[in-house]
Amino acid sequence: RVLKARLSDSHFIWKTDTSITIKNLNKKLKNVLFYQGLGSLYEKTIRLSKVSKCFSSLFNVDETLAKEASLLSKFDLVSEMVAEFPELQGIMGSYFTKLDGKSKEVSIAISEHYKPKGISDEMPTTNLGAMLSMIDNIDTLTGFFIINKKPTGSKDPFALRRAGFSIVQILMKFKLNISISDLFTESFNSYKNS
């Protein structure tokens, strides 16, 4: 009985979410704060799209797909499904973009960009997913360092160490030869220009 009610709720939420266009969900990100002093989640996606131009060739991905994946990477966070089931972030974005006719590459990248979640977690399998994951983590690290919210020996409330480990894991797995300072310079410039 409980399972049936839960499934019925999920079906209703799915119908509600899929009745709203991705474009309108994405606009809602303008009203969702990433963090005080770091702008909205919408602004974060704009920064990601700017930085993606610099790194798409490094990852050997199409610049247009990189920009699209960056701009759509967070819209599912304002969906009812992710509000109800937060562990589905990225996964729902992938489903919604497939349903909307977006490319398979973009859908997979949206799902993969939260990987890896830890040192022993699954890695992105696609170049586009890896690039999006890396620039998202770089944006987060850069932003929190700009506002002086650095991790300490005993505290890391924003999981910045995990973000740093994720960047290193991606660089190693995809055998990317790039200066870490170049990565952060591009990200810093995207904050400066937003």
Language model regions located:
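Amphipathic alpha-helical "coupling" segments that flank catalytic cores
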Residues: 1-194
